[in-house]
Structures are given as C-alpha cells and as structure tokens.
Design a protein with these regions (language model features):
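ABC ATPase C-loop
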Residues: 50-51
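Conserved catalytic motifs of ABC-family nucleotide-binding domains
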Residues: 54
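Helical segment within the ABC ATPase nucleotide-binding domain
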Residues: 73-85
Length: 136
C-alpha cells in the first residue's frame, strides 16, 4: 500500500487504515507477500494501492478476471463501496450483468465498436441486449 502513496505520503498511516477498513482481508494478510495471496486478494491489494493516491477517477481493467464467483461478488461490493466515496470508476469488465448492476452508465462494444450505451439499469432491462449479451 505504501507503494501506492508515492505521490503524497502526508497521511500515509491514516490512508492505510482507510484501506484496511475498505478491504479487511488486506489487514488480515498484511504480513504476507502479495504473491502468496489469492487472485481476489491480489486484486483487492491492487485496487487499494491505486486508492492510496486519493484519486478522482479509478480505472479498473477486468477486476474480476480469474476469480471465483464468491470473490467476484465481493469485489463488486468493494466497487460499490468505492463508488459511494464519490470516486468515478471507469471499468472494463467481461461480466456484463454484474458490471451493469453497479454502473451509472454502460457501454457495450461489439468487435471493438460502441454498439450500445445508456444507464446501467436501462441496458440491463433492454430485451435485445439481454438476449444478445446477458443470456436472456
């Protein structure tokens, strides 16, 4: 987490405590090397490290890739908690259904081009989008 605070370490210890509150597993595993953590735990460390700079925008590229369904749900809950802190989140995610559930706005790409866009709940409830991308 300290690596993520390299830009501004004025409140390093308080920021670390905030990350421990947001991601309790990190506090529990703080004496382990990141390479010894599970994929989901490493993702939480990566997100917490990015949050150490107190960003206005957090960019996430496939945050749930390679994690179990249980951990995926947990990661999306963390994303919702971050969103509540008024941090804008730009996320690329293959799990369209869960991503749209937590999104204010969504964009669906087809062969690299924007095919659909709108509010997350609108896209989730669109019959054609559900059939083509969300399994019906």
């Amino acid at each position: 987490l300290e690596m993520g605070a390299f830009i501004n370490d004025d409140n390093l210890s308080s920021r670390i405590e905030e990350m421990y509150d947001l991601f309790p597993i990190i506090k529990e595993k703080k004496d382990q090397f990141a390479g010894e953590l599970s994929g989901g735990q490493r993702q939480q460390v990566a997100i917490a490290r990015a949050l150490m700079t107190n960003p206005d925008v957090l960019m996430l590229d496939e945050p749930t890739a390679g994690v179990s369904p249980v951990i995926m749900t947990e990661l999306f809950q963390h994303i919702l908690n971050i969103k509540k802190q008024n941090i804008a989140i730009l996320m690329v995610e293959q799990n369209a259904r869960q991503a749209l559930e937590v999104s204010d706005r969504g964009y669906i790409l087809v062969t690299g081009k924007n095919a659909y866009e709108g509010k997350g709940d609108y896209l989730l409830n669109d019959k054609d989008i559900r059939k083509a991308f969300l399994g019906g």
